[in-house]
Amino acid sequence: MKTPQLPPLIIKKSPSAFYVYTYKNKWDPEKKRSYRASFKKVGTVTSGEKEGRIRWDDHFLAERPELRDFICERKGKDYVFTPMNEGGFTLSQAMEVKQLHAGATWALDQLVVQSPIGEALKTAFPQRRDYLKVLSIAYFIILNQDNNISKYPTFAEATRLPWGAPLHPSSIGRIFREIKKQQIEKYFSALQEGLIEQKREVGDDDKLTLALDSTSISSYANKLPNVERGRNKDEDNLPQINLLMLVESKSGLPIFYRTYDGNVPDVQTVRRVIADNSRLGIQNVVLVSDRGYSGTKNINDCLRNKVGFLLNMKCGISGSLTQELIDEERLNLQDLNRRDWYTQVFQVTKKINWIYEPSPVKNQKSTKKTQESEELYWHIYFDRQIAENARQGLFERIDRVREKLANGKALDENEQTLLEEVFEKHEQDDAVSYSIDNKKVDQKLRYKGYRVLVSDEISDAGKAWCAYQERWIVEDTFKTLKSRLGCSRNRVSDNESLTGKTFVQFLATSIAMIVRTRLRKYSEECKKNTALPMVYDGDCRVLDSLNNVMQTKFCGGYYFGEIAGKRRKLFEALGFRLNEGS
């Protein structure tokens, strides 16, 4: 078979791919030399690099039909042709049989399709099927338990992935840099809409309960704009960025995140999150947060933006409304009739008419005409066991301080603070002695064991307590991100890459949380002795086992290896019923 002859060709790079162009030489009489002109695109290098297989455009194939019988690859500066057989493959391709690890990625594919993630990705990244590339990198992070992208080519060579073509680290870096804030926000909106639609389909019209919390991600790159030194929650002596997430409590699915400079305190981040949710049209939600995010400003911001909330208020602020309400209800919270049998804590609910400014204007004083009011539910709880544990703990710390003072030993920093807080110093002549101030001890213990949750949505104290307890899901999400997926460090050198990589790590965490939620639900529902026993944190071992289900790939198609015994039960634990012939 005669090898086709090609016209003069040149490779040109665009932001997304390498394209093949024909051209004609023209003579420049002034410079007395030829130059290239009349460029026309005729194909694309499918590898994403300068070298690789070329996919010819239809108009070029119509002009040169003989090219249909060959596979053309660019190697160096040469174009190498290989004849194809009747099936459209070369002889070497027809004889090639490849085995890939496929069970885990097949399961992840099904989870993505069944969740709102799949459609949200297509909505946010429609061009060039980029969502498949992003998804493949996320699978790598999940299964490799590492965010070191240099290991991706080796992993992809042996693993069935949504994007089957090679992705070199430089290509992945380009993908990270191309992920923009607008695409991420489009993903958030589509994800939230999909989640609400799924809830409606099963008759659940309740608002989304979103657990809110933040963590710190350390970085070795000191020159990134957002990397600052702050209160590192992992106690690393490294600069960091702060990452705040919203996680849907029932499904365990993270639906929103935002990064902040490492030196921004938690309480200042919520106002921006509330504004973001309002701007993106994320509605019908109730934010559930810990004490780090409570405060009058955040309550007012939630009310202004029509965002539901359940905030855990700080009980230690002297003279606050929280302490005032506790003092008012202290006797009621000793009444056994106020003790809830399910939560096993004493509880009281007070309705407070909360006055706020719906549209504050800078430097303009608020008046009755401009103010509005909202009825808020202040749920006050008392747990005797927590109060007693705090009392005993304080007594033990006081005893250690007294023992060290008696023996002339030095106090550490915490002990010195306690000495100043609850001891009275006595100086007589040259002698110094200390005695315990019982009033100060009582004051230190006065608000121990109490919790105050405030909400504009949840009027029942028991439901509010349960909704708050479910916020552990966001802590589990951070554990998954940082420990399970190995993303406690950002290995990037520029801010554009940081934006994209953070999103892909968020996506990987979202998919991993679906796996964890499915396994946890399966474990809770299993009552038969024959059920597969599940352990907490078992998702890693489950995916490792499924990853050994192989796919044999050949020129005409593929088939999976036999799935039996334990692996069949693992698929069932994730919600997939396989045919007996599988």
Model-derived features with residue positions:
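Basic, amphipathic alpha-helical segments enriched in Lys/Arg and hydrophobic/aromatic residues
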Residues: 494-515
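Short amphipathic alpha-helical "interface-anchor" segments enriched in bulky aromatics
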Residues: 464-491
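Dynamic "connector" segments at or just before major functional cores
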Residues: 1-221, 244-256, 263, 271, ...
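An anionic, glycine-rich sequence signature occurring as long contiguous blocks
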Residues: 239, 259, 308-467, 537-582
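Active-site beta-loop-alpha junctions of metal-dependent nucleic acid enzymes
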Residues: 258-280
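Secondary-structure transition/capping motifs at alpha-helix termini
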Residues: 29, 159-165, 182, 202-203, ...
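Acidic, metal-coordinating catalytic cores used for nucleic-acid/nucleotide bond scission
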Residues: 288-297, 315-318, 496-499
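Short, glycine/acidic-rich hinge or "gate" loops at secondary-structure transitions
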Residues: 519-533
